[in-house]
């Protein structure tokens, strides 16, 4: 069975160095209309004893820019709890 091609995102750090991430999944919360994305660093494979590092962001599509999104930090405990619940559900599948 062929492995599904993952979306990749480049995120620059505070020094301007670019880091490549694989998209784990995206979801939108109907009640708030906010969208979230979960990413893992490229090249970091999940081992038997070690879990892959997962980064979560709120995102918005940039108007007029195809395949371009703006990432925002998750700021509230309620958002973190919801993202964690979604990740746990995704991990169980």
Curated annotation (Swiss-Prot):
Pfam families: DUF1292. It comes from the Bacteria. Coiled coil: none annotated. Belongs to the UPF0473 family. This is UPF0473 protein BH1270.
